[in-house]
Amino acid sequence: MKRIKSGDEVIVIAGKSKGHIGKVLRVIDDAVVVEGGNLIKKHIKPNPQKPENKGGIITREAPLHVSNVAHYNPVTKKADKVGFKYLESNGVSKKVRYYKSNNEIIDRI
């Protein structure tokens, strides 16, 4: 099961964007793209076949390895580990993600 999903709030714990808090835009295998984190400048060559591509230097987010980010717990305002557990309700057990520091449930899977 993936511990980090698209839309989660994470904090960068290593690299040039260390300390940056942002939302996960997308997950790519073992990498995540964090909103406003790990910004790079990309040089784009003009393409006459595509009128929207004028060329130049653009700034965009590059992927970060999942080991360089951690879940951000808004209650403790710190990086936190995520665990999985099963909760039983009405005879049906559901798998949930929770913060290990304060056992607060993040979401149901």
Curated annotation (Swiss-Prot):
InterPro entries according to UniProt: KOW, Rib_uL2_dom2, Ribosomal_uL24, Ribosomal_uL24_CS, Ribosomal_uL24_KOW, Translation_prot_SH3-like_sf
A Pfam entry, by short name: ribosomal_L24
GO MF annotations in UniProt: rRNA binding; structural constituent of ribosome
One of the protein's GO biological processes: translation
Keywords: Ribonucleoprotein, Ribosomal protein, RNA-binding, rRNA-binding
Origin superkingdom: Bacteria
The keyword Lipoprotein appears for this protein: no
GO CC annotations, alphabetized: ribonucleoprotein complex; ribosome
Function description: One of two assembly initiator proteins, it binds directly to the 5'-end of the 23S rRNA, where it nucleates assembly of the 50S subunit. One of the proteins that surrounds the polypeptide exit tunnel on the outside of the subunit.
Family: Belongs to the universal ribosomal protein uL24 family.
SUBUNIT field: Part of the 50S ribosomal subunit.
Protein name in UniProt: Large ribosomal subunit protein uL24
Source species of the chain: Legionella pneumophila (strain Corby)
